[in-house]
């Protein structure tokens, strides 16, 4: 289920047909940052502005959306995509989605051992507590999709440790949000990260694998 406020935010962006930045050669992330700011700045001019808080640099997610109930908060990551796969791995975002931890409890940075410790000790199935993505199509900015991480159908697992879980937006956009249990989503995302790491180790040269074993 997608909360009404998030559907309303998505519809506002869809109807505005926001101008998306031209790609900057070798600097795709720069263009994406510009687009994220453009989307949030637009929302702050609408009647939804009182529900929108722009996150500071280095905070997880790009904005916080307050529910109409005046209490519930949704962490939203804004993506602009040409329909290709996009890196969507976020330790803090996933930790928030799968635990009872509040926004003010989230660590600034953490390693994987700390991530696993917290996600196991604070594990909680809370409806609509998720790490949300709003994806705007770079080729047609009226094509906007809203998904929670737990609702994604098209996760891709990679052996690249800096780019592990990706979303295939081209496939995702034509599908309805995935309905699955908390445990099923946990396996896809949290255990999916483990599978990515194992793939990375498996692809190492034998000499390096031996060094890894010695270190462990």
Regions found by a protein language model. Give the residues of each.
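Short acidic/polar mixed-charge low-complexity motifs
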Residues: 70-72
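Conserved catalytic cores of phosphodiester-cleaving nucleases, focusing on short active-site segments
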Residues: 63, 74-82
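Nucleic-acid endonuclease domains
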Residues: 1-59, 68, 80-216
């Amino acid at each position: 289920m997608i909360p009404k406020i998030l559907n309303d935010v998505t519809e506002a962006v869809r109807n505005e047909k926001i101008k998306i930045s031209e790609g900057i050669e070798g600097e795709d992330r720069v263009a994406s940052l510009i687009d994220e700011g453009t989307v949030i700045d637009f929302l702050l001019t609408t009647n939804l502005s009182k529900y929108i808080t722009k996150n500071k640099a280095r905070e997880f997610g790009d904005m916080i959306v307050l529910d109409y109930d005046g209490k519930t908060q949704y962490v939203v990551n804004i993506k602009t995509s040409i329909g290709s796969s996009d890196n969507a791995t976020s330790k803090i975002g996933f930790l928030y989605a799968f635990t009872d931890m509040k926004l003010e409890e989230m660590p600034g940075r953490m390693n994987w051992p700390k991530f696993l410790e917290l996600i196991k000790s604070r594990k909680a199935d809370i409806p609509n507590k998720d790490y949300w993505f709003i994806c705007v199509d770079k080729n047609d900015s009226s094509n906007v999709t809203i998904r929670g991480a737990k609702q994604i159908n098209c996760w891709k697992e990679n052996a690249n440790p800096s780019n592990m879980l990706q979303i295939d937006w081209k496939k995702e956009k034509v599908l309805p949000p995935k309905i699955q249990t908390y445990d099923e989503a946990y396996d896809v995302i949290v255990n999916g990260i483990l599978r990515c790491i194992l793939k990375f180790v498996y692809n190492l040269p034998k000499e390096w694998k031996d060094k890894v074993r010695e270190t462990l």
